[in-house]
Design a protein with these regions (language model features):
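Histidine-centered catalytic/metal-binding microenvironments
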Residues: 235-261
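Catalytic-core regions of glycoside hydrolase
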Residues: 1-205, 212, 249-258
Length: 261
């Protein structure tokens, strides 16, 4: 066997789908922000599991996720030093608002501190499936946000993973697979920036467009510039409007749709 075991709660484990036994319910705190409601409960179990592993296999490590209502670091407890954590965020690509960007950074730095600032113990997973999977087929691109994120976090982690959409993923159905193609330009940019976050976004984008579209490159550059500016330059506030309405009434109003056409 390898030197690291993996444990994660079910991907769909939201508060209503978590264990409802009396012992577990006592450990939930629904009065806290969503990402903190079950952190103590989840990581107390992870800590016990890690110590049990250490007692039998002293050189083994336990890898786990910080996600959903246990995304924030637990307060007032120690994480065993044989535990590695991957922080899962679904909102970095929405972080054109500096406040939202900084809130995510604060959680990342809190986790790093709890793991004794060991970059090899801390990973970041950008879970980017919205809006293309569930909300809207409108293309979205966020290369400048992504670059800022990589530069801001490269001293606290030595790994960053991004899941996206796969045109061959059968569980998504035909419509879901077609949605995947609209994300490919951003997937390409992400791949290049992961290798070197110092790259110029403008130069990378032009390289992609020139090699992909040939004689239509100038037109497609204007198209992609508009997509980027409408995503990165207009923050969405969930408190004021649902995302579908925001995308189709604000981000892409009638004037912008005519411009894209």
């Amino acid at each position: 066997l390898g030197k690291e075991g993996y444990f994660a709660f079910n991907d769909g484990m939201t508060p209503e789908n978590s264990c409802q036994c009396s012992a577990c319910r006592r450990q939930y705190n629904p009065a806290l922000p969503f990402e903190k409601q079950a952190s103590g409960w989840a990581f107390r179990f992870v800590a016990r599991y890690a110590e049990a592993i250490r007692a039998i296999w002293p050189d083994r490590r336990l890898a786990t996720l910080a996600y959903q209502h246990y995304q924030a670091p637990p307060e007032g407890m120690r994480i065993p030093d044989n535990v590695d954590v991957t922080y899962v965020t679904k909102i970095v690509h929405y972080a054109s608002d500096p406040d939202l960007f900084n809130q995510e950074l604060e959680k990342v730095h809190a986790w790093s501190k709890l793991l004794n600032n060991k970059t090899e113990r801390f990973g970041i997973w950008l879970n980017i499936v919205d809006p293309a999977t569930y909300t809207s087929k409108v293309p979205f691109m966020y290369p400048n946000i992504f670059k800022r994120w990589l530069l801001a976090t490269r001293d606290v982690t030595d790994s960053c993973f991004i899941n996206g959409l796969n045109s061959r993923l059968n569980r998504s159905g035909e419509e879901g697979r077609l949605n995947a193609f609209s994300t490919y330009p951003m997937v390409w940019l992400q791949s290049r920036l992961l290798w070197n976050p110092e790259y110029s976004v403008d130069e990378l984008l032009w390289d992609y467009i020139r090699n992909s579209f040939g004689p239509a490159a100038d037109t497609m550059r204007r198209f992609h510039d508009l997509i980027i500016s409408r995503w990165e330059g207009i923050p969405w506030s969930p408190e004021t409007m649902d995302e579908i309405a925001f995308i189709h009434c604000v981000r892409y109003d009638e004037e912008r749709v005519r411009e894209l056409k």
